[in-house]
């Protein structure tokens, strides 16, 4: 591999099995295929030396699946985005009072826990899917990457919006990033080159998701959610 560097191999014994979790730094690549190939070579070597059988994929890495493991331990990039908006701007642009935002914030996480959903957010997957398609990412990874934690906090003369995305498998080299249109979009974002270009892309995606979470929260709290859909969606059909 031109990008992969083995950091460690974690061991998780269960029943009469041992799960080996290969942890790699994949540079600016998302790295799923890279890790798979590296793990195959390592497991073949272990089998040759010990005679132990193995399955390359156990499901423990939660690839393309939402899991508590990836929320806690992360997979790929982990990003926290935060912004503070003044009360006057919240009222003028988002058309909502901070007190209404706080009321909805009390309700949303409670009902989500009742439903058994993972994470506390509204629709992170919308932002991720759009940008993943535009920048050549593996859109199937939205299933695991869209689990996050959205929070608001009242501050002096404003409100702080905060979003944590603990598991983002994105890259700026390899895979769909080689496509011409996707390369052009990465250039527009300033993520087509540089040592930390994949980190920058992850930050942009998280910030975009935060903006979308803020918008939907405001629409729901101010009871304008349906109105917006009727004006910009159904009325055009």
Predicted regions: what is each one?
Residues 10, 115-116, 192:
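Short secondary-structure boundary micro-motifs
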Residues 2-11, 49-61, 100-104, 138-146, ...:
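Flexible, glycine/charged-enriched surface loops at secondary-structure junctions
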């Amino acid at each position: 591999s031109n990008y992969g560097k083995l950091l460690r191999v974690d061991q998780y014994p269960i029943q009469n099995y041992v799960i080996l979790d290969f942890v790699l730094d994949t540079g600016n690549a998302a790295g799923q295929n890279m890790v798979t190939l590296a793990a195959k070579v390592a497991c073949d070597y272990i089998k040759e030396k010990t005679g132990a059988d193995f399955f390359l994929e156990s499901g423990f890495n939660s690839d393309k699946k939402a899991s508590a493991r990836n929320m806690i331990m992360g997979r790929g990039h982990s990003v926290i985005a935060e912004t503070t908006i003044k009360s006057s701007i919240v009222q003028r642009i988002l058309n909502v009072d901070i007190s209404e935002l706080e009321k909805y914030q009390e309700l949303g996480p409670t009902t989500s826990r009742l439903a058994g959903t993972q994470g506390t957010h509204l629709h992170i997957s919308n932002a991720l899917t759009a940008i993943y398609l535009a920048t050549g990412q593996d859109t199937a990874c939205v299933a695991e990457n869209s689990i996050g934690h959205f929070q608001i906090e009242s501050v002096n003369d404003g409100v702080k919006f905060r979003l944590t995305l603990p598991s983002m498998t994105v890259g700026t080299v390899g895979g769909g990033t080689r496509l011409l249109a996707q390369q052009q979009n990465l250039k527009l974002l300033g993520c087509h080159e540089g040592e930390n270009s994949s980190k920058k892309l992850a930050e942009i995606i998280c910030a975009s998701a935060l903006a979308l979470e803020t918008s939907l929260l405001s629409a729901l709290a101010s009871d304008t959610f349906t109105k917006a859909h009727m004006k910009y969606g159904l009325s055009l059909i």
